[in-house]
Design a protein with these regions (language model features):
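N-terminal, positively charged/glycine-rich alpha-helical extensions of SAM-dependent methyltransferases
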Residues: 1-38, 317-320
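Conserved Class I S-adenosyl-L-methionine
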Residues: 220-320
Length: 320
């Protein structure tokens, strides 16, 4: 069963900002999983007009999504405004970047404004610094929710799933990926106090409970090998971040501790000269029913008048 995590939101935001500086240099894991997600889109008939990318970071996947769905408006949401500035710079002309800079620096007002209006289909990508637990979108305003390897940074996964259901339109699609429970299980070292990863069955149950239909969940192992322990650490930090637990040790990791970590990884080097790492990658998608459940668990009820026979009128009970 999914439960709220012990993650510190402030620490998550600071780590995301630090990773934004060099995320693209160590982005192999996210890009590989993203490509696998895109292959699944080839099998799904869906034509969105509004796409919400949750936890987009520097939005390296935005060009591919926008190319696939040229008619759609792309909305990228992330905790880090710094990451989104990189995304805006990479995807828009300088004139749009200047406007976006002022926009992001006044995030509070913009987010309040977005709650009152749905985005317009088509046009340039839009990037918004926002809490993924409270998206600045009105109800039933998005056709496709896309989230690539962002799950481990959700403080309250159940609240995020409920928010996804709130903003998705009837017959809209949710597609996401996440690190699974078996990720890094065999990785030893002083940083073993990593955030616990979800079980795919628990995610499926949460989707159904929130109101999504026909969830399809799959898990596969990604076997990686690194020649240098330092590269392994750098790539995992780019994909996962550091220790953001509320009860984490606040002091810096000393050189001696870091050296012991490197030595522990080196001791795991296999016969082919590589240090192995195993990640469990969960991929899932689900649909929002055409008759979408309302907030507070309510469901819409439609009353259809009984067919009127030819030449007769419906019989109504007499008024008292």
């Amino acid at each position: 069963m999914l439960k709220p995590s012990d993650l510190d939101p402030k620490s998550l935001r600071l780590q995301a900002t630090r990773r934004a500086r060099n995320a693209l240099e160590r982005d192999f894991i996210a890009r590989e999983v993203e490509q696998r997600m895109a292959e699944r889109l080839d099998l799904i008939r869906h034509v969105p007009t509004i796409i919400a990318d949750i936890g987009c970071g520097r939005a390296a996947g935005q060009p591919a999504l926008s190319a696939r769905y040229a008619q759609a408006t792309y909305l990228g949401f992330d905790l880090s405004a710094a990451a989104l500035r990189h995304a805006q710079h990479a995807s828009a002309p300088a004139s749009m970047l200047a406007r976006a800079g002022r926009w992001l620096s006044q995030a509070g007002g913009v987010l309040t404004g977005l709650r009152g209006a749905a985005p317009v289909a088509g046009g340039a990508p839009i990037f918004v610094a926002a809490d993924t637990h409270k998206l600045p979108l009105r109800n039933s305003s998005v056709d496709l929710i896309w989230s690539n390897l962002a799950w481990h940074g959700f403080v309250d996964p159940l609240a995020v799933v409920a928010e996804w259901h709130r903003v998705v339109r009837p017959e809209g699609l949710l597609m996401f990926s996440a690190f699974g429970v078996d990720s890094l299980r065999d990785l030893l070292g002083p940083q073993a106090e990593l955030v616990s990863f979800p079980d795919m069955h628990d995610i499926g149950d949460a989707l159904v409970h929130a109101g999504f239909a026909e969830p399809v969940m799959d898990a596969e192992r990604m076997n990686l090998g690194y020649r240098r322990a330092e590269d392994l650490i750098a790539e995992l930090r780019a994909a996962l971040g550091g220790n953001a637990l509320t009860g984490r040790r606040r002091s810096l990791l000393g050189r001696a501790v870091y050296r012991r970590w490197i030595d522990a990884l080196e001791s795991r080097r296999s016969a082919d000269g590589l240090i192995p790492v195993v990640l469990e990658i969960i991929q899932g998608h689900a649909w929002c029913p055409s008759r979408k459940r309302l907030p507070e668990g309510l469901s819409p009820v439609t009353f259809t008048p009984r067919a009127v026979r030819s030449g007769t009128a419906p019989i109504l009970p007499p008024r008292e």
